[in-house]
Amino acid sequence: MMPLGLFPLPRAAAVLLISLLTLPAQAAERVISLSPSTTELAYAAGLGDKLVAVSAYSDYPESAKKLEHVASWQGINVERILALKPDLILAWRGGNPQRPLDQLAALGIPIFYSDPTHIDQIASDLDKLAQYSPHPEQAHQAAEQFRQHVNTLRDRYARSQPKRTFLQFGTQPLFTSSGHTLQSEVVSLCGGENIFADSRVPWPQVSREQVMTRKPQVIVVSGTQSQVDNVSAFWLPQLVVPVIALNEDWFNRASPRILLAAQQLCQQMASIPTPVAESH
C-alpha cells in the first residue's frame, strides 16, 4: 500500500499547500516598486493594494497610474522613499542604480531584486514574492499559470521550421540581443533562431553589414505597426524580409505579460513561409 504522503495531490490542492507553507509571519504592508516590470509582478503576486509608490512608466494595471512616482531614468528619490516608510522595496537589478539601493538596504529596508534572464525565472519571482504577499495563493497560482502557458507554447511550436531571426532595437546606432536575454528566449520559444545568439554581451551594437552577412529570414522589433514600414525601408534594397512588430510593453518588460508578446510572435512567425530553397 502506498504511504499517504506519496499520493499525488490535485494541482489546486498542491498550490494551496505551497501557499500555506510559504505564508509569512507578517506580509508586507507598504511596498514600493522601482520599475514597471516589478510593478506588474507586484500586482500579479497579490501585492497591488500594498503599493504606496512606483517608478515612472508604471502604467499597468490601470490602478498603478494613480500611484506616486519615486524613481525614473534620472534616478531614485531616496529621501521621498524614506518618508513613505516602506517595509519592502521591489528593484530591477539590471536597471536601477545600485548605490541608492545599498543606502536603503543599510537602513534595514528589505529589497527584493528581480532581473530574469530566462523566461521561467518570471514564475520563480512570483513564487518568491508569495512570502511577502497577503495573498500568497494568488502569487503561486500566477506562477503556475505562467509555467503552463510557457509549456503550451513550447509544445505547440517545438516542431516549427527554424527561421533565422534578427532582433532589432533602434537604427542609428543599431542594437540587437544576444542569446542571454528574455527577448531572445521568446524568439526561441516560437521557433526562431537569434542570429546574434553567440554574442558575448547581452545587447551588442552591430553594423548593417554584420546583419546582412548572417542572412536573417525575419526581423523582430518592438513598437507599433508603423515600425514595420520604417524598418523595411531602412533595409532596402539589400534586404527584403518580413518584419514583425511586437507590443513594446509586453515584449520589453520582465513580467507575466511577456507571454502576450510570445503568443503574438509565435502566431506571426508561424504564418511566414520558409523559403523553398531552404526548406530541405
Curated annotation (Swiss-Prot):
Disulfide bonds join 190-266. Residues 1-27 form the signal peptide. GO terms for molecular function: cobalamin binding. Keywords: Disulfide bond, Periplasm, Signal, Transport. The complex is composed of two ATP-binding proteins (BtuD), two transmembrane proteins (BtuC) and a solute-binding protein (BtuF). Part of the ABC transporter complex BtuCDF involved in vitamin B12 import. Binds vitamin B12 and delivers it to the periplasmic surface of BtuC. This is Vitamin B12-binding protein. The lineage of its organism: Bacteria, Pseudomonadati, Pseudomonadota, Gammaproteobacteria, Enterobacterales. The gene is btuF.
